[in-house]
Curated annotation (Swiss-Prot):
The keyword Aminoacyl-tRNA synthetase does not apply. Residues 18-47, 65-95 form the 4Fe-4S ferredoxin-type domain. Homodimer. Ferredoxins are iron-sulfur proteins that transfer electrons in a wide variety of metabolic reactions. [4Fe-4S] cluster 1 binds at residues 27, 30, 33, 37. This is Ferredoxin-3. [4Fe-4S] cluster 2 binds at residues 75, 78, 81, 85. It comes from Nostoc sp. (strain PCC 7120 / SAG 25.82 / UTEX 2576). Pfam families: Fer4_7 (PF12838). GO terms for molecular function: 4 iron, 4 sulfur cluster binding; metal ion binding.
Amino acid sequence: MAVLTGLTFGGNTWTPKFAESIDKDKCIGCGRCIKVCGYPVLDLKALNEEGEFVEDEEDDEIERKVMVVAHPENCIGCQACARICPKNCYTHNPLEN
């Protein structure tokens, strides 16, 4: 199977790996990843005590917030989010044809 690769400015080959998922059990919702990402890829979502996503931000059942890959189509594959994550929550994979 073919994998998307590119060349760096220096002529080295580079295989971008795109954000696929974030482990909600590991994520602490610190927001470092969304600050370092220059593209609208991530979003902070609320979880209730059962670990289910809550749509209503005013809901009293909100336990905590975690980051999610809301728009994977906007990811450029730089992995800056994974490098800055203190809890190693990210799963990245190369783009395959």
